[in-house]
Amino acid sequence: RGFAETVEVYLLNNLNDTRGFCIDMTGYKTNADVNKALQTHSCYSYQGSVSVDQGFDVSKISNGEFNLPFFNVCMEVENAESSSGLILRGCDKSPKQQFVFEDDGKIKPINDPGLCLTASGDYREGGGGSPVHLIRDLSLLVCDASFSTRQNWGVRSVN
């Protein structure tokens, strides 16, 4: 596997965690579980690097593919309806793995542009970190200005 520059995909609004919330695999770093749904989690970049379970191939995002190269999987819509979760599958360029990353930060499935990748309003504590890491669920909800703090995303590497 060639080296890919990886970036975090993070909520532009930090909400209640100064480290920010990043799209994250369930489980810890290299031991993350590809069979579990994606979530958002305190971003790990404060530790000095992009973590493998939050590291997306920056070159593929512009083509609408959210690829985690360490695990060789892509973000996929679980089912084509509002409140769908986001799962991980082998990358196959199927429409369920194609997203539009709009200039304002909204991430929409190509087949359903009325839905936006959304972090949940409620949160829970994770297993580690000081202060403790926070987790929010990730799903597709109707794009709505009142949810903008939980629907507008950016990408960043570690400077």
Where are these regions (language model features)?
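Lectin-like carbohydrate-binding module/patch detector with strong preference for beta-trefoil
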Residues: 1-159
